[in-house]
């Protein structure tokens, strides 16, 4: 059985980002120099966290433009979505949360490849852009472009990355 990955269901996520204003993405890198947090993304990364959440929920039968965007990436762009499914709440409440958060580390190169694919889709694919806009994530491209730049050097060095979010 695969480990639980993704957002805990503690709050309802609306299709509007008004309820996500307080969401902040944390991107951590682990390499020979230790663990460090990368700079914050534009908008705190709220649009990217929403995309991650909907990408993770795509197999549950829900309908949302960001779920459709994830499916479009998988089917039409042949993008592996697994790297987008490895994130967790960044403030553990117990030992189980701590263990799950620790299991979210992944190769930075794999996340970089997925982020590059998402960025290319949002930059060049009219349907991809439209789905992001309909999903109330107009800031997604700016966040993904910033993350792409932040991941370039750690990915080239073989570092690991962990995505988490804070409410």
Regions found by a protein language model. Name each.
Residues 7-159, 165-167:
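Acidic (Asp/Glu-rich) sequence patches and key acidic residues
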């Amino acid at each position: 059985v695969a480990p639980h990955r993704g957002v805990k269901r503690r709050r309802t996520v609306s299709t509007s980002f008004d309820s996500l204003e307080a969401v902040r993405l944390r991107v951590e890198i682990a390499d020979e120099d230790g663990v460090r947090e990368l700079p914050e993304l534009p908008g705190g990364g709220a649009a990217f966290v929403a995309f991650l959440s909907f990408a993770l929920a795509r197999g549950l039968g829900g309908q949302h433009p960001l779920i459709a965007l994830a499916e479009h990436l998988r089917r039409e762009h042949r993008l592996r979505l697994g790297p987008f499914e490895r994130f967790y709440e960044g403030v553990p409440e117990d030992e189980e949360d701590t263990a799950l958060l620790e299991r979210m580390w992944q190769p930075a190169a794999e996340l970089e490849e997925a982020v590059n694919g998402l960025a290319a889709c949002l930059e060049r694919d009219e349907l991809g852009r439209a789905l992001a806009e309909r999903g109330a994530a107009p800031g997604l491209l700016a966040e993904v472009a910033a993350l792409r730049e932040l991941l370039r050097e750690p990915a080239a060095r073989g570092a690991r990355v962990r995505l988490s979010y804070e409410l």
